């Protein structure tokens, strides 16, 4: 039985053009209040980004849904996520695909996210404390890559971890950020600009 707040969230997503029933069902299975501080739980189903500590945020539900829908995910897919953060986006992905490999540079966030995945009985997720710019070579190649922090440029190491036909969604830019969709076809990469966004920066090398 879905709560009134969850129903309202799903209705809002539909009004914003999110009509993929598999995606909406996946989001309905992930209680957003588990991924934020208890003091902010009254805002859990608002369409807004919220702080999760360590200078990081949980993205607004619309952006989570939009980025996920652009990846054209199949149940058999293997997905790389750069920036586990709270784990909310990871959990949505895990309800849609065969396996999610997620990299987080802040150890405490990785640890907290792993506890949430266990609580939700999600066992098709691997997490790693590492540099997102490097990806996770040994787990690849990936059918899809989602980057949840803004890079100054598209990391070449991530492009090389896309399988043929693979899709990537990534915010790129400095003062002005643009959500980019990239599809790999053989050794060619096709780029498409989606919309202006606002994400925390994808920091290279500095593990915390």
Curated annotation (Swiss-Prot):
Main location: cytoplasm
Subcellular location: Cytoplasm
InterPro entries for this protein: PCMT, SAM-dependent_MTases_sf
Record bears the keyword Methyltransferase: yes
Keywords noted in UniProt: Cytoplasm, Methyltransferase, S-adenosyl-L-methionine, Transferase
Pfam families assigned to the protein according to its UniProt record, in alphabetical order: PCMT
Catalyzed reactions: [protein]-L-isoaspartate + S-adenosyl-L-methionine = [protein]-L-isoaspartate alpha-methyl ester + S-adenosyl-L-homocysteine
Residues annotated as the enzyme's active site: 59
Cellular component annotations (GO), alphabetically ordered: cytoplasm
EC number: 2.1.1.77
GO biological process: methylation; protein modification process; protein repair
Molecular-function GO terms, alphabetical: protein-L-isoaspartate (D-aspartate) O-methyltransferase activity
Family note: Belongs to the methyltransferase superfamily. L-isoaspartyl/D-aspartyl protein methyltransferase family.
PANTHER family named among the record's database cross-references: PROTEIN-L-ISOASPARTATE O-METHYLTRANSFERASE (PTHR11579), PROTEIN-L-ISOASPARTATE(D-ASPARTATE) O-METHYLTRANSFERASE (PTHR11579:SF0)
Cited function: Catalyzes the methyl esterification of L-isoaspartyl residues in peptides and proteins that result from spontaneous decomposition of normal L-aspartyl and L-asparaginyl residues. It plays a role in the repair and/or degradation of damaged proteins.
Identification of the protein by name: Protein-L-isoaspartate O-methyltransferase
Protein's organism: Proteus mirabilis (strain HI4320)
